[in-house]
Amino acid sequence: ERIKTWPFMIFVVILTGVIYPIQGSWVWGAGWLSEMGFSDFAGSTLVHSTGGWAALAGAIVLGARKGKFGPNGQVNPMPGANLPLATLGTFILWFGWFGFNGGSQLALGSAADASAIAIVYVNTNLAAAAGVVVAMIMTQLMFKKMDLTLCLNGAIGGLAVPLIDKLKIDDVVGAISAHLVCGIWGTLAVGIFGSGQIVTQFIGIVSIGAFVFITSLIVWSILKVTVGIRVDEEAEM
């Protein structure tokens, strides 16, 4: 809605063709983080946090929408224009998680594999459902009414939107809260509740986050200086 198409596509190519494979090889390519015992079964850090760090860098360089933040720092609501379509998209994503998360087991040839996938399916559904319920309760307590967009983000996993707004970062689709924040939590949770080591998990989060964020910030800044990344004010409005 405020970014030029071609600079965005250039960044997508660099992210998927350069940044993502490098940090992915550190874990899934038997790299140094894998040797340390860092655990990321389905991509909490390698997929979700990576996208979140890249989105954070882009949002900082791009700047907020016109009128999003007032002169005194107040946040002006700018709700989406098609909530039914957003709701449909959330449920499509919810359904797709079963293939994405379950498929990370990479095998279905034994009872142990089937049992592991069943646990993944149950946890996936419970996590999304719990996210919706918590978002409904929290928005009712905080805003005196339920907010559909935050409830949808709750299913994906994010209630950090108010914090992002306070930092004056305009994240239209909630990518930072839903993917970055929850990706970090998902990775730490392995060290807290699972078989991973909390220190190793933290090292992985920091190292991958620093690499992706700094690299993305450099790429976005170069695109901004060379070809420009923001549409003119008339097109934005």
Model-based region annotation:
Residues 1-237:
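Hydrophobic alpha-helical transmembrane bundles of multi-pass membrane proteins
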